[in-house]
Amino acid sequence: AQSVQNFRVNWDDDAFQRCIESRELFRPEGRRPVDFKGKFLTAAGQIDIPRSPQGRPVLVQAGSSEPGRQLAAETAEMVFTAQQTLEEAKAFRLDLHRRMRDIGRDPASLKVMPGVYPLVGRTQMEAEDLRAQLDDLTHPDVGLFLLGGMTGTDLRGLPLDAPLPEAPADFNGNRSRQTLLVEMAKRRNMTLRDLYLEVSGARGHWSIYGGPKEIADQLEEWFVEGAAD
């Protein structure tokens, strides 16, 4: 992450002159060549792309694993995360703030943005009807394929009303999402059908359904309660 940041700022703001008269594209003295030596990576040189008006892109980290949280605390300006409940989201944000304080960063410099999958109708009933229509469009084979890929389980041939089988501990994928889905299935006593319908739309993010006011109230609650920025 530090190496990438160095390359993003290896030109002065006014280095690229693009002067037709002098045929000078950039001022040589405006360069800041990178010579980075880290524990696992060595990188030297510079990129030939000028800085944006903002200086550099926003640094965003996605995920909720232990290494991901620490990386976010050390380097990120925004975190995109999947959290299913208000309490889980609050705990996640507080944990990031604690890690930041431990290394001397101001928690206010990081924005936590949980993913949300809203279905908005004119009324609660209309939103629920829309959800049912979308669920009917999801083929079981597609839903099971998505769910199996996110949990590391082979679900082929299993009854749709069966519970999620035990997920492998050596899953070589998004482990934080695997954990989220396994815990959600246990907490809500979900069948494979319930779970793949949830995954096929929201991909494990927070799903909310209702009228405009109900949706806005729920989003506001997460912000006011300290679950999101």
Segments from the language model and where they lie:
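Hydrophobic faces of well-ordered beta-strands that scaffold small-molecule active sites
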Residues: 57-62, 77-81, 110-117, 223, ...
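Short amphipathic alpha-helical segments
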Residues: 73, 93-94
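Long, repeat-rich segments with strong aromatic
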Residues: 69-78, 83-85
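An alpha-helical appendage that flanks or caps ligand/catalytic pockets
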Residues: 1-55, 87-91, 97-223
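Short glycine-enriched loops at secondary-structure junctions
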Residues: 64-66
